[in-house]
UniProtKB/Swiss-Prot annotation:
UniProt-listed Enzyme Commission number(s): 2.5.1.7
Protein name: UDP-N-acetylglucosamine 1-carboxyvinyltransferase
Family: Belongs to the EPSP synthase family. MurA subfamily.
Species per Swiss-Prot/TrEMBL record: Pseudomonas aeruginosa (strain ATCC 15692 / DSM 22644 / CIP 104116 / JCM 14847 / LMG 12228 / 1C / PRS 101 / PAO1)
Entry GO CC: cytoplasm
Active-site residues annotated for this sequence: C117
Length: 421
């Protein structure tokens, strides 16, 4: 397994471009299964999860065409099997997103129960109950979700989400696009990635209204056609590099991003002492060489502070002036990185769903192990602000969510390199 070696102590300084959002790209790729003519998806990040989704299509008989810019053209009319097998689904939770489109377009689907990050119990029952509300017959047996649409196809329905679910909202929105009649999703996720999927569906000929609010109304249509669509920028990658710059007292300019979908994070960085300026597609952060001030953070669904940025802020707080509390309300079991950071000299106390971080002037490099995607990003930031060398093991977690992380950090002046396992 590859490892990252980071020699800390350098302030980040420079410009990089932000990749397309994985959490937008995966549902949009799944949505291409709904169309009866080819769909081209652009601005895809070069990530393992994207490769896995493309491989999953290949297993199903759909052979995407990939150009030199990694734009992917999908023609789902060649589909041969409606099974998403366990050996692929187990590596990536987002495979569940093919369930709604396959069921709506082809009338049946068989999808293995998903794997993915080891954070908390992320149930798929909302997906199942929502599709049942649209008339689907679903059984879970042998580790597979086996779904059949009624004769004549899925029917529009009303569904209320007991808890806000991003992938649940996306799956039902895609299924409803080809259902008969109107579907109303209440307590729907409001994330920018949900809005991006709705925009893509509408570009394909769907009628989706209200995405970005907690009530989404979908009028089913008879068919969806081809489109060319650009995936939105990755707000979590953007936030991660901003926090890395803030923690090191540096200055960065991030291009091809969108400041309007990151307001909660930018506000907290300003509170930490960062000078931030923005344009329509760029963000600049300058700490002017200063140490950050500790901030309090409480995660919640969008538009509040994102759970996927919590670990990075713990790293910044670890070397900040003062004490900051980070409260995690979205997932349980999401402080696994804290114990690794304490081995580097951080002073972090976990009490239930709260991490209390007392800043220290410097962390010390140490061998550490990544446990999930965002936790691994926090260890990279910790390595950047530590004295000496930090060796991060199990970086396949990082590669699931960050495109060329060591190359981008090198462009910003970090001493970081990948060593083959």
């Amino acid at each position: 397994m590859d490892k990252l070696i980071i020699t800390g102590g350098n302030r980040l300084d420079g410009e990089i471009r932000i990749s397309g959002a994985k959490n937008s790209a995966l549902p949009i790729l799944a949505a291409t299964l709904l169309a009866d003519t080819p769909v081209t998806v652009c601005n895809l990040p070069h990530l393992h999860d994207i490769t896995t989704m493309i491989e999953l299509f290949g297993r199903m008989g759909v052979q995407p065409i990939i150009d030199e810019k990694l734009n992917v053209e999908v023609d789902a009319s060649s589909i041969k099997t409606l099974v998403a097998p366990y050996e692929l689904v187990k590596t990536m939770r987002a495979s569940i997103l093919v369930l709604g489109p396959m069921l709506a377009r082809f009338g049946e689907a068989e999808v293995a129960l998903p794997g993915g990050c080891a954070i908390g119990s992320r149930p798929v029952d909302l997906h199942i109950r929502g599709l049942e509300a649209m008339g689907a017959q679903i059984e879970v047996e042998g580790g597979y979700i086996k779904a059949k649409a009624p004769a004549g196809g899925l029917r529009g329905g009303h569904f209320f989400f007991d808890t806000v679910s991003v992938t649940g909202t996306e799956n039902l929105m895609m299924a409803a696009a080809l259902a008969n009649g109107r579907t109303v999703l209440q307590n729907a996720a409001r994330e920018p990635e949900v809005v991006d999927l709705a925009n893509c569906l509408n570009a394909m000929g769907a009628n989706v209204q209200g995405a970005g609010s907690d009530t989404i109304v979908i009028e089913g249509v008879k068919r969806l056609g081809g489109a060319r669509y650009d995936v939105l920028p990755d707000r979590i990658e953007t936030g991660t590099y901003l926090v890395a710059a803030a923690a090191t007292g540096g200055r960065v300019k991030l291009k091809d991003t969108d400041p309007t979908i990151l307001e909660a994070v930018l506000q907290k960085l300003e509170e930490a002492g960062a000078h931030i300026s923005t344009g329509s597609n760029w963000i600049e952060l300058d700490m002017k060489g200063n140490r950050p001030k500790a901030v309090n953070v409480r995660t919640a669904p969008y538009p509040a502070f994102p759970t996927d940025m919590q670990a990075q802020f713990i790293s910044m707080n670890a070397v900040a002036e003062g004490t900051g509390a980070v409260i995690e309300t979205v997932f349980e079991n999401r402080f696994m990185h804290v114990y690794e950071m304490n081995r580097m000299g951080a002073q972090i106390l976990v009490e239930g769903n709260t991490a209390i971080v007392t800043g220290v002037p410097k962390l010390k490099g140490a061998p550490v192990m990544a446990t999930d995607l965002r936790a691994s990003a926090s260890l990279v930031i910790a390595g950047l602000v530590a004295e000496g060398d930090t060796l991060i093991d199990r970086i396949y977690h990082i590669d699931r969510g960050y495109e060329c992380i060591e190359e981008k950090l090198q462009l910003l002046g970090a001493k970081i390199r990948r060593v083959p396992g």
